[in-house]
């Protein structure tokens, strides 16, 4: 039996079939790859704005919410706390918040829209630890000049109750203020700018 002749029809069929299978494989591999470029539902939810009811926060107390996987400290400040903020400005590294991360619509001295409600991202600007809320005045471990604020237990940075860092601390900047807006007197939306709300 002689095999001299090439079956052109069979060759075309094999080339076409191989091309179709190869193209299907390439599309099958590309679909999950392209899909990985887009955020998952979980990632979208993590970056979504968060509504927080602040009506139950007692004066001088703090609550913690979560936004984008970060703690958000929310403090209801008293007149005494607000008065103490002015007394310690000379001890602060950036008292007018010129170098700080905060929306333009917050008052740079009290670092909030409404003086009595403070929102801060609760991550130290030094190495990312979470500062502890220390509202008491002149505790033994923080000294007689302490008027309340935040203490970072990792490396000892001190912040006042506006999130402003004291001079000569490891932390280089004030605690960040997240974008936020008021839906009502009791509901704050963290993650939505007042200017865009």
Tell what function each PLM region has.
Residues 41, 54-61, 71, 96, ...:
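Solvent-exposed, flexible loop/coil residues
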Residues 61-108:
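Extracytoplasmic/periplasmic/luminal assembly and interaction segments
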């Amino acid at each position: 039996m002689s095999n001299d002749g090439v079956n052109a029809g069979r060759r075309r069929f094999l080339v076409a079939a191989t091309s179709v299978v190869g193209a299907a494989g390439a599309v099958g591999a590309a679909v999950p790859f392209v899909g990985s470029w887009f955020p998952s539902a979980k990632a979208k939810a993590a970056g979504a704005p968060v509504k927080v009811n602040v009506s139950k926060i007692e004066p001088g107390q703090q609550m913690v919410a979560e936004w984008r996987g970060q703690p958000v400290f929310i403090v209801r400040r008293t007149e005494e706390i607000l008065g103490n903020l002015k007394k310690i400005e000379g001890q602060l590294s950036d008292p007018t918040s010129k170098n700080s991360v905060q929306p333009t619509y917050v008052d740079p001295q009290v670092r909030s829209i409404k003086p009595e409600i403070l929102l801060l991202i609760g991550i130290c600007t030094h190495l990312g630890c979470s500062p502890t809320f220390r509202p008491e005045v002149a505790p033994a471990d923080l000294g007689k000049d302490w008027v309340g604020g935040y203490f970072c237990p990792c490396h000892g940075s001190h912040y006042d109750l506006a999130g402003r860092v004291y001079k000569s601390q490891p932390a280089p900047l004030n605690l960040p203020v997240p974008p936020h807006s008021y839906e009502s007197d009791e509901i704050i939306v963290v993650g939505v700018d007042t200017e865009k709300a």
